[in-house]
Amino acid sequence: MTRQEVLEIFARYRGESPAITGPSFGGRILYTVDHRPATLYNMELGYPTAMFLGLALCLPSERVFVIEGDGSMLAGLSVLTTIGRYRPCNLVVIVVDNRAYVTTGSVPSATASGADLVAMAKGAGIEKAFRAADLSVFEQCMKRSIAEDGPFFIVADIEKEDMASIGKSKAMPFDIVESCVRFRRTLEDRGLVPPIWSV
């Protein structure tokens, strides 16, 4: 399965829930597939899951989604133990695993040599940690993630990617600063966070 196929299924089940993407072209693909205003795009390596763990704990009535790559997840592994400790039932983490750092020349990541993110998540105390190697399994995981209490940790094994095969994606029409402002304004408009001037 491809990254785009995974994101298309994700978009069908996400609804209007807040979501965050990791760095690089994954966010740009999601923007093209199905842009929603409550999306924080292109967060730095290692930070997406940590940031939305905090959001999940602050907004327990909102299901929140993280989409990041294997490289970004590997850069922020310590967050898994914190998820296992606090177990926010509304947090869904999706790791799109292509086993490489594509934008740096497809340098293999640790998952290419056997590092098992699902086993790490389970070892950290995340019971609902699953691997999806095909679209039907990934879709079943998505269905469960919106119907059951989490936290969920889903690793989607996708086809090998490189810059030649995926092509150069279009640049985002805004930078990370504007993405943050838009994201916060959306949460504010929904009454989920106080107006910025009252903080």
Predicted regions and their residues:
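Long, charge-dense
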Residues: 96-107
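Generic beta-sheet signal
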Residues: 17-19, 62-66, 91, 148-156
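Thiamine diphosphate
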Residues: 28-98
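Glycine-rich beta-alpha junction loops
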Residues: 23-26, 98-100, 157-163
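Glycine/aspartate-rich loop-and-adjacent alpha/beta segment that forms the canonical ThDP
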Residues: 3-4, 35, 148-199
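Short active-site-adjacent structural elements
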Residues: 28-30, 103-104, 140-141, 161-167
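Active-site diphosphate/adenylate-binding microenvironment
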Residues: 1-44
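Conserved thiamine diphosphate
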Residues: 108-144
